[in-house]
Curated annotation (Swiss-Prot):
This is Delta-aminolevulinic acid dehydratase. One of its GO terms (biological process) is heme biosynthetic process. InterPro entries: ALAD, ALAD_AS, Aldolase_TIM. It comes from Aquifex aeolicus (strain VF5). Its EC number is 4.2.1.24. Keywords: Heme biosynthesis, Lyase, Magnesium, Metal-binding, Porphyrin biosynthesis, Zinc. NCBIfam families: PRK09283.1. It catalyses: 2 5-aminolevulinate = porphobilinogen + 2 H2O + H(+). Catalyzes an early step in the biosynthesis of tetrapyrroles. Binds two molecules of 5-aminolevulinate per subunit, each at a distinct site, and catalyzes their condensation to form porphobilinogen. Binds 1 zinc ion per monomer. One of its GO terms (molecular function) is porphobilinogen synthase activity. Zn(2+) binds at residues 123, 125, 133.
Length: 330
């Protein structure tokens, strides 16, 4: 590849003013790239801020519609729902109950805000007494028993209005059985966004407070991925695509930009990246202390995720980013 030499080649010529920089800009972040996470909890008339995530709230079902309308009115096309039930049990049965927290939220949102695209997180950690992502056996998650419960959960979500389901538990074979369950129940049109490369990350701390989903014992390293592994991430992604994933995800995003890029180069399905709670809270905390320009660092972070190859980004910054776009700050 010939790139030219100085002095005949001067890259600064194309940085001389904002107009030329706009013309040659390679990566663009738009409203169409954003998905906003929303926490729905039990109770009534509840709007409570998550202490470790300034600006992020938990909503009761009767209050969640206002939050969704705000997202819709900003031009953000999609939300992803996480539920916090009143009652937990050993298997997380609220996840497939007709009166489960997600089911009630889905019905209300789809009735009152039908033009928002609703993705549901499909897992068990928020719903089990032990905080792990499935059925326990000998102090570990039993993979195949968990698959049976996942099938019940996704069909229930689809019946109550989910536009897309997003299994996040990192169970082997989960995409295959979910696709089969949806198809058999008459939901062949419902896509699957698989949390394909989900790492056992320390960046999840604030989320576990928000969703009340911290494990009661041990950790999740027997099912979530080792942060040291890159080739294994690609293996997980390719297996999910073969099993029927319509979208694949890398989580977290910022510390795993290399994984996003590798996945993008090796699959033909859209790639989602999850800009997780710890990434959000780090920027919020440093911004509050005046150590960084919060808006600029937030924008640069999201832009880096898009540049790495993400086709869509789940981010708690979605509303902030949308306002910057609308107000012409970028």
């Amino acid at each position: 590849m010939i790139v030219g030499r100085f002095p005949s080649s001067r890259p600064r010529r194309l940085r001389r003013n904002e107009n030329i920089r706009r013309l040659v800009r390679e990566t663009h972040l738009t409203l169409d790239d954003l998905i906003y996470p929303i926490f729905v909890r039990w109770g009534e008339n509840v709007v409570e801020e998550v202490p470790s995530m300034p600006g992020v709230y938990r909503y009761s079902v009767d209050k969640v519609v206002d939050a969704v309308k705000e997202v819709r009115d900003l031009g953000i096309p999609a939300i992803i729902l996480f539920g916090i039930p009143e009652h937990k049990d050993e298997v997380g049965s609220d996840t497939w109950s007709e009166e489960g927290i997600i089911q009630r939220a889905l019905r209300k949102i789809k009735k009152e805000v039908p033009d928002i695209y609703v993705i549901t997180d499909v897992c068990f950690c928020e719903y089990t007494t032990h905080g792990h992502c499935g059925v326990l056996h000998d102090h570990d998650v039993e993979n195949d028993l968990t698959l049976e419960n996942l099938k019940k959960q996704v069909v229930s979500h689809a019946e109550n209005g989910a536009d897309m389901v997003a299994p996040s538990g990192m169970m082997d074979g989960m995409v295959k059985v979910i696709r089969e369950a949806l198809d058999e129940a008459g939901f062949k049109h419902i896509p699957i966004m698989a949390y394909s490369a989900k790492f056992a990350s320390a960046y999840y701390g604030p989320f576990r407070e928000a969703a009340e989903s911290a494990p009661a014992f041990g950790d999740r390293r027997t099912y979530q991925m080792d942060p040291a592994n890159s080739r294994e991430a690609l293996k997980e992604v390719l297996m999910d695509v073969e099993e029927g994933a319509d979208v694949v995800m890398v989580k977290p995003a910022l510390a795993y930009l290399d994984i996003i890029a590798k996945v993008k180069e090796n699959v033909l399905v859209p790639v989602c990246a999850y800009n997780v709670s710890g990434e959000y809270s780090l920027i919020k905390a440093a911004g509050k202390l005046g150590w960084i320009d919060e808006k600029k660092v937030m924008w640069e972070t999201l832009l880096s995720i898009k540049r790495a190859g993400a086709d869509m980004i789940i981010t708690y910054f979605a509303k902030d980013a949308a306002r910057m776009i609308i107000e012409g700050e970028v």
